[in-house]
Amino acid sequence: MKGSDALIMALRNMAATLGVYDLMEVRVFLERSCRFVQERYRAIYVDAYMSMVVDSVLDLKAGFSGTPEMDDARYSLRDALKRLDEINAPTIVGLTVLYRTYVKGEPLHPPGTPFPGGFEVEKKDGVHYCPVKDKQSDNPEALCDICIARQSPLP
């Protein structure tokens, strides 16, 4: 079994064990993680993240059958797991991060996510760009180092 197949199988098995309590736990985790986000963005972020979590779990429970987007140049899976452990991420957050990053090849902020200054996550020519990726390098709670998005070019 290839590593990517093993990852998908592990994520499917994790998703099969998740229930309503896990969704409540992740909501609390997200609200706590976003407590310093400007108020006008906080609800947008929490709702977007919750949507990603639910979509990821439902995809995996339905038996995602796409082609994994694993890329050797990305953050190593071992390092990603270590980072998730460092921030005490609930299992469901880890599942979502790993699924979106290593299986679907999607950024952790969906395209269209707004940021102060009128900037947002964008996808151009198949590449995702984030306006704040580099600015979050000193934030121990941020998972930007795992995210596939690149820093947006300066305007």
UniProtKB/Swiss-Prot annotation:
Belongs to the UPF0305 family. NCBIfam families: PRK01022.2-5. This is UPF0305 protein MTH_811. It comes from Methanothermobacter thermautotrophicus (strain ATCC 29096 / DSM 1053 / JCM 10044 / NBRC 100330 / Delta H) (Methanobacterium thermoautotrophicum). The lineage of its organism: Archaea, Methanobacteriati, Methanobacteriota, Methanomada group, Methanobacteria.
